[in-house]
């Protein structure tokens, strides 16, 4: 019979050591998770503002490129806030709540008016509130028709707020309203 000789040193972790590691990791997670959730919420607001600025610039350029008036129409319905970029038409305003590809169909098989529709479901915890129901860009100058400045409040709950605004020429920019906790933007006038 052979005997295996054990050295005096054991390998592995004891139950106490494993519990200490679990306790330390739990404490670290409790500190990190709330800040990670907050970071995600702030990123949603920033991404919504950035996308809206890009879409307003797109609407301006499409008005010039197509030599047609291009509108950005905002709507709020129970389950979402949304907007549609579309060419002006004789059928009326587009309804972004009908979804991408259907917002400007007006019962016509050829949906040639809709350029883009963006929806923000309320479950996303970000909402848009526009000072105008529509902002229309002129093909001749890419300025806003009527020189009406647009302000869109982007609200992510609590103090996570940004504002996208256009000047009289239609150029969009992002600012942080007073009291916003989102850093890196100028304060809105």
Q: Where do the language-model regions lie?
A:
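N-terminal helix-rich module
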Residues: 2-9, 27-53, 57, 61, ...
């Amino acid at each position: 019979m052979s005997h295996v000789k054990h050295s005096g040193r054991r390998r592995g972790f004891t139950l106490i050591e494993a519990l200490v590691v679990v306790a330390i990791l739990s404490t670290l997670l409790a500190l990190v998770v709330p800040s990670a959730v907050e970071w995600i919420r702030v990123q949603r607001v920033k991404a919504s503002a950035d996308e809206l600025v890009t879409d307003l610039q797109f609407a301006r350029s499409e008005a010039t490129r197509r030599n047609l008036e291009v509108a950005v129409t905002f709507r709020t319905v129970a389950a979402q806030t949304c907007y549609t970029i579309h060419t002006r038409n004789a059928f009326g305003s587009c309804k972004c709540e009908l979804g991408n590809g259907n917002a400007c169909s007006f019962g016509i098989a050829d949906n040639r008016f809709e350029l883009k529709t963006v929806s923000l479901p309320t479950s996303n915890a970000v909402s848009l509130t526009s000072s105008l129901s529509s902002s229309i860009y002129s093909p001749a100058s890419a300025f806003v028709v009527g020189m009406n400045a647009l302000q869109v409040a982007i609200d992510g709950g609590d103090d996570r707020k940004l504002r996208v605004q256009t000047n009289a020429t239609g150029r969009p920019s992002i600012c942080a309203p007073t009291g916003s906790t989102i850093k890196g933007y100028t304060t809105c006038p």
